[in-house]
Curated annotation (Swiss-Prot):
Gene: argG
Alphabetized PROSITE patterns for the sequence: ARGININOSUCCIN_SYN_1, ARGININOSUCCIN_SYN_2
Species, as recorded: Acidovorax ebreus (strain TPSY)
Cellular localisation: Cytoplasm
Name used for this protein in its record: Argininosuccinate synthase
Database matches in Pfam families: Arginosuc_syn_C (PF20979), Arginosuc_synth (PF00764)
Pathway in which this enzyme or protein is active: Amino-acid biosynthesis; L-arginine biosynthesis; L-arginine from L-ornithine and carbamoyl phosphate: step 2/3
Sites where the protein binds L-citrulline: Y99, N135, R139, S192, T201, E203, E280
Record: residues binding L-aspartate: T131, N135, D136
Keyword ATP-binding in record: yes
GO molecular function: argininosuccinate synthase activity; ATP binding; protein homodimerization activity
Amino acid sequence: MATILQHLPVGQKVGIAFSGGLDTSAALRWMKNKGALPYAYTANLGQPDEADYDEIPRKAMEYGAEKARLIDCRTQLAHEGIAAIQAGAFHISTGGITYFNTTPLGRAVTGTMLVAAMKEDDVHIWGDGSTFKGNDIERFYRYGLLTNPALKIYKPWLDQKFIDELGGRAEMSAFMTKEGFGYKMSAEKAYSTDSNMLGATHEAKDLEFLSSGIRIVNPIMGVAFWKPEVDVPAEEVSVTFDEGQPVAVNGKEIADPVELFLELNRIGGRHGLGMSDQIENRIIEAKSRGIYEAPGMALLHIAYERLVTGIHNEDTIEQYRLNGLKLGRLLYQGRWFDPQAIMLRETAQRWVARAVTGTVTLELRRGNDYSILNTESPNLTYAPERLSMEKVEDAPFSPLDRIGQLTMRNLDISDTRGKLGVYARAGLLSLGGNAALAQLEDGGAKKK
């Protein structure tokens, strides 16, 4: 049997990642009517726009599920979010504003935990609502098969028969009404939203046009800080780390990582911290655009990186950032649990994060406008007396030391001049006149 099934497996158990929305509700009922045995699995990821998780499995049973389970994924999601912070696993940014890979992190947790729950129920066929144009279809494919190598994939949105009968939201709404459930479509927004405890993604529809921006978005994790009528008073906040683990906010210890993120989201959200507008490359190398929220992740990232720069040396910081860019791409591609990703992640957790102990105090204002007010750590290698402009006792180096350093470190100046002369004679570089190197004489090579 092929791994990806193009037709409904009649008479067999089919697990569906069930959100309770129109798409998965119609798909579940349709599969039931066509003779499959649907099993519904709902991930509790702490979605900020979900009011009642317990109601979702009840809906699934009402629509014909053989069994419906709510899987609490919040603790695992929090741990993965902290791991991403520790490793700097973020590769998408614009103008210094970062996207924190919150959807890829959510898919890593959902894809593994839901399939593990299905295995417990002897369900080995899985479907979800991802489309063939997006990233999620590949992420779920990888995480699902990683968790259960015997897994088969059935997606209604890849089944032509389903598409012919229920190809649009209007058709799905009419179908559910005909089935006696009176399902009414919610008011259409100008964009679609997907969220979890770590962040929210707004994309598609009007946001596909770059002429539409953040001003059409209604934030679900924070405030519309760009609106002048929205009052956003400045606020001081401190974040404390112990060996790379965030342990306290404003001096209050929070042992539960879920509660920690909820508190960080509340604080950062009051300012709209962590909102960004990104153009990114999907896995299939086509560009897409999204507007993102991640107030808690942003707050952790700022505090963590401040400690990293105060504690570690330049080469360690450079390697942390290079590895983080690579790890961010692997995470985005659905490879968070692949060996190459584990190697990069655990390297950062062991050799970078374990030294990150201390407290950073910030003032948050509107959006991503903030100031760092204080940095405290027993592991700081920042030592102002080394470079003080004032006279200090037992100075670590003298003027003579610097003379020696300048001489030895810059023996290559004559070599550089020579190379510039070679480039000038080859017509690659202009010396003199109005050129950038106008004052540099071509004396770097021996004249014949």
